[in-house]
Amino acid sequence: MTFVVAAVVLLTVVPLATPLKCVQCDGPLTEFDCKTTVPEAKDCPQLNTHCFRNDTFNSKNELIMVRRGCTNEKEPSPPCQEVGNGGRRCTYTCNSDGCNNAPGFAIAIEPSRMVIFIVTFSVMISFILHTSAN
């Protein structure tokens, strides 16, 4: 039983070996406009732990360019910054496969990590209850 608990805890702590997959496109520099048409998510370089979406707005608050890709930054600070002539650039990050693919961006929780956490927590509670009963 101790081995099972140790194995589950180890799986929770050690990151999975598969690389993160993010949508990667650069607005007008690719065949996809990155706003409404995006390519399939691709593997990120090993050190990149998050996906990003970078939106650039003009002074009329119109979305003029979108970039999407991989990064090792969790959250930009601040998320939005002023850029020339009253425009702004906002960067959003997330950490699950393909989470930066939506036209409107939403932060996603990696489901596999949540399942591992729930299983680990359940096994630990069962172990504690079992040992305290004896």
Swiss-Prot record:
What tissues contain this protein?
Expressed by the venom gland.
Q: Which domain of life is it from?
A: Eukaryota
Q: Which family does it belong to?
A: Belongs to the scoloptoxin-05 family.
GO annotation, cellular component aspect: extracellular region
UniProt modification remark: Contains 5 disulfide bonds.
* Location of the protein in the cell: Secreted
State the name under which the record lists this protein. U-scoloptoxin(05)-Er2a
Quote the record's miscellaneous comment.
The scoloptoxin-05 family has remarkable similarities with the three-finger toxin family commonly found in snakes.
Q: Which residues form the signal peptide?
A: 1-19
Matching entries from Gene3D superfamilies are given as: CD59
Record's keyword annotation contains Signal: yes
UniProt keyword list: Disulfide bond, Secreted, Signal, Toxin
- Upper lineage ranks? Eukaryota, Metazoa, Ecdysozoa, Arthropoda, Myriapoda
Is Manganese one of the keywords UniProt gives this record? no
The Swiss-Prot or TrEMBL record annotates one GO molecular function as:
toxin activity
